[in-house]
Amino acid sequence: MTFTVIIPARFASSRLPGKPLADINGKPMVVHVMERAQESGAQRVIVATDHPDVEVAVRQAGGEVCLTRADHNSGTERLAEVIERYGFTDDDIIVNVQGDEPLIPSVIIRQVAENLAASKAGMATLAVPIETSEEAFNPNAVKVVTDAEGYALYFSRATIPWDRERFAQSKETIGDHFLRHIGIYAYRAGFVRRYVTWAPSQLEQIELLEQLRVLWYGEKIHVAVAKAVPSVGVDTPEDLARVRQVMAGQ
């Protein structure tokens, strides 16, 4: 099995301007992500960015980069542009790794690609067990429920499945059946081509979860429990400070 990693790295960020170039121990954040992807055994790693400064930083680090349009509404649309420009075949496996995940374990990048290759779905992703009630009831922690074969039934910011008997007594403890979705995806390139032709779905717009578009149009998403739990991504200056501290100790 071979696969390509594409790393969407949008320059603008309301909470952390210029985020892909944020310095972490002497390297831009996007370069750390690129190196993690290279460690996964990917045949090819491409950074997809809308800003020439990011392009320069990636090239200086010896990486491959595609300068994309700046008007994409999502990372998936940016991914689709790269797929078309590079001429990937419909069966090629593409892994989408977020450009703000400098601590992502390389093992799960390979895992999601292997899971897609072994499944009948056009798309695969990962999840980790939820262990605290705080996380189970946190709308920023996206929950997922699956069928018996590991295909997603639904993703939600709500607490799903609702443990009726337990929660009628107390919401301070939870069972072992909650899963938190991790935002890493593998796709077949042909699936991405279809995806970007679909109009946004009602559920997607209500929950603000792009992956619900896939379920809305009757497609399957394979979900597996991740072999390693990724650390915090970088959305805020506080996140950046924490990641710098963690990486300084490695």
UniProtKB/Swiss-Prot annotation:
Which EC number(s) does UniProt give?
2.7.7.38
Which pathway is it part of? Nucleotide-sugar biosynthesis; CMP-3-deoxy-D-manno-octulosonate biosynthesis; CMP-3-deoxy-D-manno-octulosonate from 3-deoxy-D-manno-octulosonate and CTP: step 1/1; Bacterial outer membrane biogenesis; lipopolysaccharide biosynthesis
UniProtKB keywords: Cytoplasm, Lipopolysaccharide biosynthesis, Nucleotidyltransferase, Transferase
- Cystine bridges: none
Q: What class of enzyme is it?
A: transferase
Coiled-coil residue windows: none
Q: Which SUPFAM superfamilies match?
A: Nucleotide-diphospho-sugar transferases
GO cellular component terms, semicolon-separated: cytosol
An MF annotation (GO) of this entry: 3-deoxy-manno-octulosonate cytidylyltransferase activity
**Which catalytic reaction applies to this protein?**
3-deoxy-alpha-D-manno-oct-2-ulosonate + CTP = CMP-3-deoxy-beta-D-manno-octulosonate + diphosphate
Pfam families in the record: CTP_transf_3
GO terms under biological process: CMP-keto-3-deoxy-D-manno-octulosonic acid biosynthetic process; lipopolysaccharide biosynthetic process
Classification via Gene3D superfamilies:
Spore Coat Polysaccharide Biosynthesis Protein SpsA, Chain A
| Domain of life where this protein originates | Bacteria
Instruction: Give the location in the cell.
Output: Cytoplasm
Give the family per the record: Belongs to the KdsB family.
Q: What does this protein do?
A: Activates KDO (a required 8-carbon sugar) for incorporation into bacterial lipopolysaccharide in Gram-negative bacteria.
PANTHER family per the record? 3-DEOXY-MANNO-OCTULOSONATE CYTIDYLYLTRANSFERASE (PTHR42866), 3-DEOXY-MANNO-OCTULOSONATE CYTIDYLYLTRANSFERASE, MITOCHONDRIAL (PTHR42866:SF2)
Return the HAMAP family for the record: KdsB (MF_00057)
- What's the protein called, per UniProt? 3-deoxy-manno-octulosonate cytidylyltransferase
The source organism is Pectobacterium atrosepticum (strain SCRI 1043 / ATCC BAA-672)
Q: What is the gene called?
A: kdsB
